[in-house]
UniProtKB/Swiss-Prot annotation:
Coiled coil listed as a keyword: no
Keywords for the protein's UniProt record, in alphabetical order: Ribonucleoprotein, Ribosomal protein, RNA-binding, rRNA-binding
Name used for this protein in its record: Small ribosomal subunit protein uS3
Listed CDD domains: KH-II_30S_S3
Superkingdom field: Bacteria
């Protein structure tokens, strides 16, 4: 099942959380959900070149807080903050509520699955060989600390008559292990031969903070190290 399902959705409530964080009555839920979709589509369309990874939407009472995670925050902010203020006003009109806009910089875009997928899609649109684009992304991710990465490219790759899927993997990507920190991203490349899809999985290690066994082991290690240091003092 882990091979088929979206790995982020599989880990919700385990080591991942939702990108829309709000509660609403049954009558308002549908409207706010569609509003979130419109906000995301608009922001992604406006900030195509800003390497946007994800958009988190929170809704305090009669307000809206939008957080954009980007590898190029300078492109969003603009000269003296002019661009970000223009974007904030537009989002306020869309939500009909007081909207605040936060920008969070991604310091390692080479291991962010969504940004990797967007980069490969842009290279495919520029007619870069898909194998070269995939291999370059894999090498960069492993060099920056990823423990494993898998990339799928599908469509009429290289202008072939018959569509196919090619994939490349380095390291390990444990999709069934819930405590594994697996990032997942997709993108589309609109080429002259049609649309090519790109999927990226990045394994960044295991998250053990939520594992009760891991916390017990850490506590035991602390007790063991403390008793060892006490014995050394007594012997001295």
């Amino acid at each position: 099942m882990g091979q088929k399902i979206n790995p982020i959705g599989l880990r919700l409530g385990v080591n991942r959380t939702w990108d829309s964080r709000w509660y609403a009555d049954s009558g308002e839920y549908g409207r706010l959900l569609h509003e979130d979709l419109k906000i995301r589509l608009y922001v992604l369309e406006e900030l195509k070149q800003a390497a946007v990874s994800k958009i988190v939407i929170e809704r305090p009472h009669k307000k809206c807080r939008v957080t954009i995670y980007s590898a190029r925050p300078g492109l969003i902010i603009g000269k003296k903050g002019a661009d970000i203020e223009k974007l904030r006003r537009k989002l306020s009109e869309m939500t009909n509520a007081e909207t605040s806009l936060n920008i969070v910089e991604i310091h390692k875009p080479e291991i962010d699955a969504t940004i990797i997928a967007q980069s490969i899609a842009q290279q495919l649109e520029r007619r870069v060989a898909f194998r070269r684009a995939m291999k370059r992304a894999v090498q960069s991710a492993l060099r920056l600390g990823a423990e494993g990465i898998r990339i799928n490219c599908s469509g009429r790759l290289g202008g072939a008559e018959i569509a196919r899927m090619e994939w490349y993997r380095e390291g390990r990507v444990p999709l069934h292990t819930l405590r594994s920190d697996v990032d997942y991203g997709t993108a589309e490349a609109k080429t002259a031969y049609g649309i090519c899809g790109v999927k990226v999985w990045v394994f960044k290690g295991e998250i053990l903070e939520y594992d009760p066994m891991a916390s017990e082991r850490r506590a035991a290690e602390v007790d063991h190290s403390g008793s060892s240091s006490n014995r050394r003092r007594e012997n001295a």
